[in-house]
């Protein structure tokens, strides 16, 4: 891989997963980057040797996917990567109120994400799905109330948590297409985000990876088409 010193490298599985918000933020900020995508093998073994063979050779403090390499800076943990990029572009909140809202959303949306991930990777998906869908409106209502009349989740300025939140709400919308219908401000947020020029252009490009959401051992979202 021939890289200039200014080109970041994002490493992750060849899926959407935890890298979707990172990819969108890199695109939105016009960051020069290249991807190293690792492929998981097919059932029943789901061979992960493409990643495991190099996992401990990359000089990462906590070897994991995703990782971001930017010169001497080598970062793991998806939210740490997002914050690293966002700090360069003043997208972590400016006022104390904005920073508090960013901190809350960063963690709340991860909790929400993990609920769907656990469901999608569970062999009991069909058994557990009704319970997930039953509690989904209550969770979405909380996000709707938190957003209120703001344009973005920190207030009137776009921050990195909007990229996270768009991703997780979109996954839930793919899982249950009508789930946002009761929440006009969440639907408006989704449209507003998709209308950002650089995001819209990215979504129309061949770089955009909407599916698969999850890796091959998942029970849902493991294919390249819905």
Which positions does each model-derived feature cover?
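Short, solvent-exposed turn/loop segments enriched in Gly/Ser/Thr/Pro and often Arg
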Residues: 13, 160, 206
